[in-house]
From Swiss-Prot:
<keyword id="KW-0436">Ligase</keyword>
<dbReference type="GO" id="GO:0006099">
    <property type="term" value="P:tricarboxylic acid cycle"/>
</dbReference>
<dbReference type="InterPro" id="IPR005809">
    <property type="entry name" value="Succ_CoA_ligase-like_bsu"/>
</dbReference>
<keyword id="KW-0479">Metal-binding</keyword>
<dbReference type="GO" id="GO:0042709">
    <property type="term" value="C:succinate-CoA ligase complex"/>
</dbReference>
<feature type="binding site">
    <location>
        <position position="102"/>
    </location>
    <ligand>
        <name>ATP</name>
    </ligand>
</feature>
<comment type="function">
    <text>Succinyl-CoA synthetase functions in the citric acid cycle (TCA), coupling the hydrolysis of succinyl-CoA to the synthesis of either ATP or GTP and thus represents the only step of substrate-level phosphorylation in the TCA. The beta subunit provides nucleotide specificity of the enzyme and binds the substrate succinate, while the binding sites for coenzyme A and phosphate are found in the alpha subunit.</text>
</comment>
<feature type="binding site">
    <location>
        <begin position="321"/>
        <end position="323"/>
    </location>
    <ligand>
        <name>substrate</name>
    </ligand>
</feature>
<keyword id="KW-0547">Nucleotide-binding</keyword>
<dbReference type="Pfam" id="PF00549">
    <property type="entry name" value="Ligase_CoA"/>
</dbReference>
<dbReference type="InterPro" id="IPR013650">
    <property type="entry name" value="ATP-grasp_succ-CoA_synth-type"/>
</dbReference>
<dbReference type="InterPro" id="IPR017866">
    <property type="entry name" value="Succ-CoA_synthase_bsu_CS"/>
</dbReference>
<dbReference type="GO" id="GO:0000287">
    <property type="term" value="F:magnesium ion binding"/>
</dbReference>
<feature type="binding site">
    <location>
        <position position="99"/>
    </location>
    <ligand>
        <name>ATP</name>
    </ligand>
</feature>
<dbReference type="GO" id="GO:0006104">
    <property type="term" value="P:succinyl-CoA metabolic process"/>
</dbReference>
<keyword id="KW-0067">ATP-binding</keyword>
<comment type="subunit">
    <text>Heterotetramer of two alpha and two beta subunits.</text>
</comment>
Amino acid sequence: MKIHEYQGKELLRQFNVPVPNGIPAFSVDEAVKAAEKLGGPVWVVKAQIHAGGRGKGGGVKLAKSMDEVKRYASEILGMQLKTHQTGPEGQKVNRLLIEDGADIKKEYYFSIVTDRGTQKNVIMASSEGGMDIEEVAESHPEKIIKVFVDPMVGLTDADCDIIAKGIGVPEASIPMARDVFKNLYKTYWDTDASLVEINPLILEGNGKIKALDAKFNFDPNALFRHPEIVAYRDIDEEDAAEIEASKFDLTYISLDGNIGCLVNGAGLAMATMDAIKLFGGEPANFLDVGGGATAEKVTEAFKIMLKNKNVQAILVNIFGGIMRCDVIADGVVTACKVVNLTVPLVVRMKGTNEELGKKILADSGLPIISTDSMTEAATKVVAAVAKNK
């Protein structure tokens, strides 16, 4: 689960991480009143959406007068803000953050993420703040430092000093940086976050360290422990198809391609998408029906996939362990009839009741392409899309 920047900064304040004074606004009038309350003389008008790159997209403006606050608020509220993370359609801006300007001497990058490979938390930091970390990793990988934190030990003073010196924090500011790093780690740990990203973390002219931005992701499996964080949820920022899928215990993530994927198991779903890309196709979604799929769940999965008008073919890839292939086959046949499927459908099933499942598909009279291997399935679904172009 993601939250807005202003909500992230509310959390940071609770954990004694310094952030600029700021007030959220939901209208132009509220933006002006917020600026008046803050006092100025410089304000930052910031679009609030669940995506990065807002500044490059025109969603962050520096205002030096009340007239500019009003003008920028009018321009940004309601706009379809397009960034590298929103996709070409962009996201509508319904909220603003009006914030005091900052005396920026130096910008740093700081983030904490969960590293499942090492079973540790990893802090990534860089002297190149304010930039996309992907760009820094590509052009100046030597400027990114990583510190792995054992969750049984926590972040130590020695860790903090390695980070601060590694990104070039002045000696006089290292004690404060140490406190900020520790409080950021405590925020991450105590809220069950899977990501905390501060870009930029700044050094002010007075030598103080401050978080100028705040991006959070939270482990959805831990949200039952944090009703105060669940209250931050903004459904308007979430994909409608993903919300609909969650009602049926389906795990769905929209992608940019044109081949719908219905798979059981996250690992098999990832492998299926890799196979599609290997043979020149582009997956339109990640969709895991889990181990307890019914005809109803499969039908709803088809409905959700086909709401994406870019879908030109569907690949169903099932491994029947706990899941029975005949149950999936019944669901596929039912779904095809309910949604009146008009795009090519490729089905590959292996495992429990595999032959019975294939017979159900063959006897349905529907133009379903049945395959035995993942390679064959991916090849045929990509070919079906190419043929229909």
